[in-house]
């Protein structure tokens, strides 16, 4: 809490000394002030995994394509100014923009992507998103050590301005996933200047060292206070970029962020305090935005623990949660109850799974598993990253499991980096989680629960599930594909290594000076489309 108070104090001092708030000064100088939730894990696109990191990376780096800021299904040019799909329907040729540059002025080349993808697929780097590239021919074989020569992987620079990518199978969502930061390039010379290819220290990403290719570039980073990026004069589309700087603030306390917004310290908040959302809705607060968001709020279950290894126990926990009560009385900001992992309507995919609130059935399942009325069941812990909203939901579920199942629950919060580390190492029992789609396709959800995937983080393995998802991604027939994905989703919900709670909406506050911040279900806001202007 001290950190949040100090951040707010800085704004008060600045406002008093100049007579203007940061928002007012930002309008004059095109500086956007953005509440960014947690202190980022880092900004190495091949290592990080979170939303706070994405918000910064989308400014300082760029991939072959970018998402449509208005929410369209088709991606827009990034480093690649165009691309073609060959007759085999699984080989792409990406034509590079000759003006694409790194922030030090070097040209961005197809070879940069070849090296970067090799890095992302190097097992010792430990990328949790390496599977994003497994659709490329032989990429998984290289990652698994079945082949050692990266030239056998289906990504090649076929000229100074052309990159050829051959896939294992027809993959209709491939161009879409290229807008995800895990597929973006890193500057080889800079990475190797500060370590080896697989060095996870991220020294190359520090201010003064960092080189990337986005519309902005890293200017400064004050730990737990502020990250500043500034306009990159070498960006190929720099003439379109109106913002001169973006200031990102790691504000975990929702009430503090709300006060900062109302004090004129922020243009955009990360969230809205749960207790404030219904008030703002009733008062028709013009700053409140509730946008569609392709994501699911859920609880991970560590299936490697003896008392949580039985699917009957996991289903009992799921049936002991009253989701309707949570969205109506706890989150209270337009969220929808979730009965599947994949949000209904994701690219016209509608799961038919059901997770009923049924305490009696839940008790029966616990009894079958050897825990009648919860007797003998160990006290379990719910882990969540520090945020008021997560705490309130955890407290509600703690009470529900005690009353409905007779189970004792402790709740434990920690900062973002420790929270991520504990999930990576399966050092938890039940963990708060959220998954936001990386591209517009149901595969972006179901893919992560395949065995061995870096974002599975539950220890759950089901080879029938693996077979169905793998087979779904070998066909371009959408009806057949969705049928197999639906079968996989049913297995996932029946086994319950994760417990869906609600489907997200993106609730936040935004100042009317901010333009170009269009609603889109991936919540991607590319800085070159955002600017400040008063009506």
Language model regions located:
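N-terminal lobe/hinge region of extracytoplasmic solute-binding protein
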Residues: 35-87, 209-212
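A structural "hinge/loop" feature
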Residues: 38-55, 76-79, 106, 174-185, ...
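Gly/Pro-rich hinge or "lid" segments in bacterial periplasmic/extracellular proteins
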Residues: 69-70, 167-241, 245, 253-255, ...
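Aromatic- and charge-enriched surface segment that lines or borders ligand/interaction sites
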Residues: 82-131, 164, 307
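Detector for C-terminal structural segments
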Residues: 172, 222, 320-349, 388-398, ...
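Extracellular/periplasmic solute-recognition and catalytic clefts
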Residues: 219-230, 247-305, 328
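Append "and occasionally in soluble cytosolic enzymes with long acidic Gly/Pro-rich linkers
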Residues: 230-231, 308-399, 403, 487
């Amino acid at each position: 809490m001290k950190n949040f108070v100090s951040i707010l104090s800085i704004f008060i001092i600045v406002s008093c000394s100049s007579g203007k708030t940061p928002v007012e000064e930002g309008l004059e100088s095109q500086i956007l002030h953005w509440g960014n939730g947690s202190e980022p894990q880092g900004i190495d696109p091949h290592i990080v995994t979170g939303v706070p990191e994405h918000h910064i990376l989308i400014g300082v780096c760029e991939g072959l394509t970018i998402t449509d800021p208005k929410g369209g299904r088709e991606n827009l040019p990034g480093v690649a100014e165009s691309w073609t799909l060959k007759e085999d329907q699984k080989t792409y040729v990406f034509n590079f923009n000759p003006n694409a540059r790194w922030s030090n002025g070097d040209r961005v080349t197809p070879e940069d992507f070849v090296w970067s993808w090799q890095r992302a697929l190097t097992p010792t780097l430990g990328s949790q998103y390496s599977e994003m590239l497994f659709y490329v021919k032989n990429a998984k074989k290289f990652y698994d050590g079945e082949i050692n020569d990266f030239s056998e992987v289906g990504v090649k620079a076929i000229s100074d301005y052309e990159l050829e990518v051959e896939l294992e199978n027809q993959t209709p969502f491939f161009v879409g996933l290229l807008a995800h930061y895990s597929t973006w390039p890193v500057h080889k010379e800079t990475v190797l200047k500060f370590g080896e290819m697989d060095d996870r220290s991220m020294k190359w990403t520090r201010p003064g060292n960092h080189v990337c290719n986005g519309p902005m570039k890293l200017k400064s980073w004050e730990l737990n206070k502020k990250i500043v990026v500034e306009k990159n004069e070498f960006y190929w589309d720099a003439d379109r970029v109106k913002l001169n700087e973006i200031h990102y603030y790691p504000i975990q306390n929702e009430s503090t962020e709300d006060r900062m917004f109302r004090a004129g310290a922020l243009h955009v908040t990360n969230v809205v305090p749960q207790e404030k959302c219904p008030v703002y809705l009733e008062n028709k607060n013009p700053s409140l935005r509730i946008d569609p968001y392709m994501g699911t709020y859920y609880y991970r279950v560590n299936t490697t623990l003896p008392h949580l290894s039985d699917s009957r126990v996991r289903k009992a926990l799921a049936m002991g949660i009253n989701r309707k009560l949570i969205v109506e009385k706890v989150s209270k900001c337009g969220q929808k109850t979730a009965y599947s992992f994949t949000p209904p309507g994701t690219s016209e995919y509608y799961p038919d799974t059901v997770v009923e609130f049924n305490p009696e059935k839940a008790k029966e399942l616990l009894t079958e598993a050897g825990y009648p009325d919860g007797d003998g069941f160990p006290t379990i812990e719910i882990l969540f990253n520090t945020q008021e909203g997560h705490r309130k939901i955890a407290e509600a579920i703690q009470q529900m499991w005690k009353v409905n199942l007779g189970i004792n629950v402790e709740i434990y919060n920690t900062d973002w980096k420790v929270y991520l580390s504990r999930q990576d190492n399966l050092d938890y029992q039940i963990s708060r989680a959220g998954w936001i789609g990386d591209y517009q396709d149901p595969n972006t959800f179901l893919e992560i629960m395949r065995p061995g995937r870096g974002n599975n983080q539950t220890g759950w393995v089901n080879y029938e599930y693996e077979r169905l998802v793998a087979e779904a991604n070998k066909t371009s027939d959408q009806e057949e594909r969705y049928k197999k994905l639906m079968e996989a989703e049913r297995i996932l919900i029946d086994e319950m290594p994760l417990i869906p709670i609600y489907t997200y909406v993106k609730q936040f506050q935004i100042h009317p000076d901010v333009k170009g911040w269009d609603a889109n279900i991936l919540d991607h806001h590319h800085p070159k489309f955002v600017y400040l202007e008063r009506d």
